[in-house]
Amino acid sequence: MKKELMLRCANNFVLQNSVCLLGFLRLVKSHLTGRVGIIKARSFKGKRTNCTSTCVHLNNMEVTYLSQSLAQTIDNELMSDDVGYTTEQLMELAGLSIAQIICREYSFDKFKKILIFCGPGNNGGDGLVAARHLKQFGYDITVAYPKENTKVLFQRLLNLLHHYHVPVVKSATGEDIKMYDLVVDALFGFSFRGEPRSPFDEIIHMINQSNKPVVSVDVPSGINIDGDTAGTALSVNSEMNISLMLPKEGVRHYRKKHYLGGRFIPNSIVEKYNLKIPQFTGDNSYVQL
């Protein structure tokens, strides 16, 4: 009898403590779930789009702003035999992140028709890639390509757009722009110097006169990349900028919506140049600055 009583007491002790432990674990789980819920709510605060990806807005983050010469040095090193990227790979990574950011910020139902102005250099190539991805996302895309690049890489990008039924036109007028909900400026990137020349000066003026929302790729076309002056007399007045690799000195004081896209700088380059890169979250290819 005494042995049976002792066994019963032991079982009750285990049961009571198990219940307490279970209650404690439930409390912890509830607390953590609540915290996660808050984080998710903050991540999705603002506009909802047809995209499923999220972005965390980080405040007071450390980020390196690149001079024109350092940006060129890093770009060359990324495509060196030592690192091993190709131009095509970098364009695909950049173009996809551009498309994802646009998809996040400009909902499909309000900004379905997009006109993308592409320049003759790699910035324009990023725009051509973004056009293809945006088409796949369901947007109605037109590319304006006033000065076509005849290199094989760019011809392949144009051929892909043809197979995705994306119209590519040589020019667009102010009246043409009125038909679109959003304009993307992929004319000039970080290698641009001097003042925009014809036909790009007219295009920039036309974009600014359109009163349409404008997104710039890497930098607003026409600005001084090093930011040591107010910029050129004529530059794109965009409402959002998508920096690539790292932001450039010319957009250090950019006070409108600003993203960093691409996520392709390897650790060795970060360490070599002591770069400060904002923390990307999860599988996101971009972060809001």
Swiss-Prot record:
(6S)-NADPHX binds at residues 122-126, 189-195, 218. Keywords: Isomerase, Metal-binding, NAD, NADP, Nucleotide-binding, Potassium. K(+) binds at residues 123, 185, 221. It catalyses: (6R)-NADHX = (6S)-NADHX; (6R)-NADPHX = (6S)-NADPHX. Binds 1 potassium ion per subunit. It comes from the Eukaryota. Gene3D superfamilies: YjeF N-terminal domain (3.40.50.10260). Its cofactor is K(+). GO terms for molecular function: metal ion binding; NAD(P)HX epimerase activity; nucleotide binding. It is an enzyme of class 5 (isomerase). The keyword GTP-binding does not apply. Pfam families: YjeF_N. Residues 71-277 form the YjeF N-terminal domain. GO terms for cellular component: mitochondrion. Its EC number is 5.1.99.6. InterPro entries: YjeF_N_dom, YjeF_N_dom_sf, YJEFN_prot_NAXE-like. The keyword NADP applies. Catalyzes the epimerization of the S- and R-forms of NAD(P)HX, a damaged form of NAD(P)H that is a result of enzymatic or heat-dependent hydration. This is a prerequisite for the S-specific NAD(P)H-hydrate dehydratase to allow the repair of both epimers of NAD(P)HX. Belongs to the NnrE/AIBP family. This is NAD(P)H-hydrate epimerase. It comes from Plasmodium knowlesi (strain H).
